[in-house]
């Protein structure tokens, strides 16, 4: 018997060893490894008496100089964040974050090295919308902050505290949301800057509750002294404007403490910004600057700090609301000419896409766009992803290796984050395109509505696998390069001379790739030739705007001085017979 057992063991031992090794290699790792540590997060009744829906976020940081909620980024200096959805969370009930909860950049609290950390929690509150398309969705309505989860009014958060974290130890770390973000006061009007807001009939009908859009308006010198004047309107598109920034009516603060700009590598860049803001005020009010009205549109919404200024299945008819409700209101209130030949668009990055996108979608309503470093305008180069041909957004196709696609670089090509990093950060901040961040808003604007009422994903947010059926919808509706090529026979005559695009050839987000592709088409056009401009900045990063004479850190502060004189030149060339070219051309 003993001999038989010995023979069996001799035969079975190699097989058992193989099975043992396979079991070990198949054990869950990193984000899936077991840990009994938990974080229990709650809020007291004195802070909020009602049950709340939203996204519960836990931030863990090694840096005690700032609150952890302000330390989450795509770059290598980011701290840790974990998130879960909560529905109907009542006062004193605990939301639990354990090792099964997905995090960024570490995938689980089980991966956190033992040590002392600063911890903070925050509840990003959702509102329930009963939309006109029949869907009921829960989203974070903007509350005047421009979709900033870490400072949105009404959000609950905890006082940061230092705790010892050891995932190998059983226990629960309790966190109380003892504070609430205060309301944001309305901006102050001045002689030159005015703020307007209207309730949009179109958006109110779509969202099933009152929805507003607004504008920060910069009035020309002499506006009150020349009541007979009627002005061209310039729309400076871009991210959410609290007020009309870049315009300073007083000299730079002599007591301003200089700060360092890591983006530009400049000490005292805040002082430079104030100097150029004041310089614009001096130019604007001087005798020779063209007299026009400039607006920055306020169209923050439940998905992002702006809407991309076009109609969308998920966001609603923001394009029509801005073009046919807000702009006529502004033009009437501030004595603008009120015709397409006297309206112009410019902006950078998001504003660059909006400038070109609005010009393409509403070709007769505007007389020219100046699009700097636009977000992807050809989805064959959705940054560096070809959504029509690539299988995965995060990794290059390979049988034997995983090469990640980069997401952010500097002008030397040094990588600070990957596309997977960026998207996983957003996934922690919010599921179903609710992060309020860049990739999610592109998806919200461009995608059809999914069966659950939320944007249908262009790719799996966790794995990067692309859904090519969604990509086809994007192509037909929002790929600006494709739309121009498809419809040039009808669009071409309306857009001749109106398209101007600028981009650095080392744009941090690879936005120049799409510009190369659209340029190939534009330069091939005839009947008519597009007769515009596409230009590149050598070694220029995001967001180069066509200025070859000054560094990017300076030229980005001079959009108005760069483009408004060119707008006036185009008005002089293209205004229809009998157009008013004189009432607004006064000196003082």
Predicted regions and their residues:
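Non-catalytic cap/lid and distal C-terminal segments of serine-dependent acyl enzymes
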Residues: 62-102, 107-588
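Bacterial Sec-dependent signal peptides at the C-terminal "C-region" and cleavage site
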Residues: 8-36
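Contiguous beta-strand segments within globular domains
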Residues: 34-43, 49-57, 212-216, 235
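N-terminal secretory signal peptides that target proteins for export/translocation
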Residues: 1-7
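Sec-dependent signal peptide recognition
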Residues: 7-18, 137-147
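N-terminal processing/targeting junctions
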Residues: 20, 38, 224-226
């Amino acid at each position: 018997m003993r001999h038989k057992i010995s023979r069996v063991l001799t035969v079975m031992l190699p097989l058992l060893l193989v099975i043992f090794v396979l079991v070990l290699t198949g054990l869950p790792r990193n984000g899936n490894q077991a840990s009994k540590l938990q974080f229990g997060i709650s809020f007291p009744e004195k802070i909020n008496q009602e049950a709340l829906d939203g996204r519960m976020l836990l931030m863990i940081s090694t840096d005690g100089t700032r609150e952890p909620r302000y330390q989450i980024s795509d770059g290598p200096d980011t701290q840790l964040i974990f998130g879960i959805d909560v529905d109907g969370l009542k006062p004193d009930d605990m939301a639990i974050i354990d090792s099964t909860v997905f995090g960024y950049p570490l995938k689980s609290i089980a991966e956190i090295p033992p040590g002392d950390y600063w911890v903070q929690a925050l509840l990003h509150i959702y509102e329930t919308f009963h939309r006109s398309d029949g869907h009921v969705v829960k989203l974070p309505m903007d509350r005047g902050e421009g979709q900033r989860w870490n400072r949105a009014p009404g959000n609950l958060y905890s006082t940061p505290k230092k705790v010892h974290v050891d995932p190998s130890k059983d226990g629960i770390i309790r966190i109380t949301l003892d504070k609430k973000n205060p309301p944001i006061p309305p901006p102050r009007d001045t002689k030159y800057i005015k703020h307007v807001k209207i309730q949009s009939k179109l958006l109110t009908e779509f969202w099933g509750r009152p929805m507003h859009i607004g504008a920060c308006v910069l009035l020309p010198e002499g506006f009150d002294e020349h009541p007979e004047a009627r002005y061209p309107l310039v729309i400076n598109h871009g991210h959410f404007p609290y007020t009309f920034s870049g315009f300073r009516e007083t000299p730079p603060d002599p007591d301003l403490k200089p700060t360092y700009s890591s983006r530009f590598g400049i000490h005292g860049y805040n002082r430079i910004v104030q100097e150029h803001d004041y310089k614009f005020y001096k130019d604007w009010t001087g005798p020779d600057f063209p007299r026009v009205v400039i607006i920055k549109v306020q169209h923050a919404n439940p998905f992002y700090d702006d809407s991309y200024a076009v109609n969308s299945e998920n966001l609603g008819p923001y394009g029509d609301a801005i073009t046919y409700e807000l702009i006529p209101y502004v033009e009437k209130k501030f004595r603008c000419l009120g015709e397409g030949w006297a309206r112009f668009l410019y902006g950078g990055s998001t504003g660059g896409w909006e400038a070109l996108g609005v010009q393409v979608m509403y070709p007769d309503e505007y007389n020219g766009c100046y699009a700097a470093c636009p977000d992807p305008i050809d989805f064959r180069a959705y940054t560096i992803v070809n959504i029509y041909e690539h299988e995965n957004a995060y990794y290059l196709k390979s049988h034997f290796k995983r090469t990640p696609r980069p997401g952010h670089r500097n002008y030397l090509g040094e990588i600070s984050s990957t596309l997977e990093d960026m998207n996983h950060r957003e996934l922690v901040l919010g599921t179903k395109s609710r992060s309020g961040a860049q990739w999610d808003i592109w998806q919200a604007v461009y995608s059809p509505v999914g069966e659950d009422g939320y944007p249908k994903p262009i790719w799996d947010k966790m794995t990067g696998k692309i859904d090519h059926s969604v990509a086809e919808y994007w192509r037909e509706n929002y790929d600006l390069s494709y739309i121009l090529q498809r419809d040039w026979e009808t669009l071409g005559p309306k857009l001749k001379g109106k398209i101007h695009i600028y981009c650095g050839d080392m744009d941090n987000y690879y936005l120049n790739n799409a510009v190369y592709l659209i340029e190939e088409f534009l330069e091939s056009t005839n009947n008519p030739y597009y007769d515009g401009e596409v230009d590149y900045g050598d070694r220029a990063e995001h967001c180069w705007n066509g200025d070859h004479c000054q560094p990017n850190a300076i030229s980005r502060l001079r959009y108005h001085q760069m483009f408004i004189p060119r707008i006036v030149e185009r008005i002089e060339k293209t205004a229809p017979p009998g157009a008013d070219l004189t009432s607004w051309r006064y000196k003082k």
